[in-house]
Design a protein with these regions (language model features):
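Flexible, glycine-rich phosphate/dinucleotide-binding loops
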Residues: 15, 40, 87, 110-111, ...
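FAD-binding core/adjacent interface of flavoenzyme oxidoreductases
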Residues: 1-7, 32, 66-147
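Conserved phosphate-binding and hydrolysis motifs of nucleotide-dependent enzymes
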Residues: 10-15, 106, 150-155
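Short beta->alpha junction loops/turns
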Residues: 11-12, 39, 94, 129, ...
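Predominantly flavin-linked oxidoreductase catalytic cores and closely associated redox partners
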Residues: 123-196
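Beta1-alpha1 glycine-rich phosphate/pyrophosphate-binding loop at the start
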Residues: 2-72, 161-186
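Aromatic side chains
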Residues: 48, 96-98, 153
Length: 196
């Protein structure tokens, strides 16, 4: 069993921030971050993989950010949390005991199951897994037309980046305008004109 003062489950933005802030606030305690992938994507940079960057490796959060702060990193999928005994077990049967636990496992995309065809081949929700994102990158090389569902910040960024590669992109938003949650109508009208 591995012992740590603070165990953080999740190695993306929330987990990294939690571990880093704990290091600053509590000094020399033992901190361990468990994540389920070897590499962690910069979440807000994911759309740029498909245009500006052309690869996932340029969108990886460096482990050095944590290791330089003497934060331990472990790769594994947590399958059990025993809050009474303050232990966590991974799929590989590694067990960690902790004094404090932070669960920062991130978000998942909303799948619009009300749209017929959402389960078909070549429909890709965006997950933060590097291998999965690489598979999408490879698939994009073989297509000419791309539909992006969702006209919020991420959808608009995806549409813009993919269009930079010469693909015909259709951006679909169920509201009256893209980016409507962040800007007023006059501004969203201007944005839509620019996107066309």
């Amino acid at each position: 069993m591995k012992k740590t003062d603070l165990l953080v489950i999740g190695g993306s933005a929330g987990g990294i921030l939690s571990a880093s802030m704990a290091r600053k606030a509590y000094g020399d305690i033992d901190i361990t971050v468990i994540r389920d992938t070897d590499a962690v994507m910069v979440p807000c940079g994911i759309p740029y993989i498909y245009g500006t960057l052309h690869c996932t490796s340029k969108n990886v959060i460096p482990d050095k950010m944590l290791t330089d702060s003497k934060i331990n990193l472990a790769v594994g999928t947590v399958v059990k949390i025993d809050k009474d005994n303050k232990t966590v077990t991974t799929k590989n049967n590694d067990t960690y005991s902790y004094k404090k636990l932070v669960i920062a496992t991130g978000s998942l995309p909303i799948i619009p199951t009300f749209i017929p065809g959402h389960e078909l081949e070549n429909v890709f929700p965006i997950y933060k897994n590097q291998d999965y994102l690489n598979a999408i990158l490879e698939k994009l090389e073989t297509v000419e037309n791309v539909a992006v569902i969702g006209g919020g910040f991420i959808g608009v960024e995806f549409a813009e980046q993919i269009s930079m590669t010469g693909k015909k992109v259709t951006l679909v938003e169920m509201a009256d305008a893209c980016l409507w949650q962040a800007f007023d109508k006059s501004f969203t009208d201007d944005i839509e004109k620019m996107m066309k």
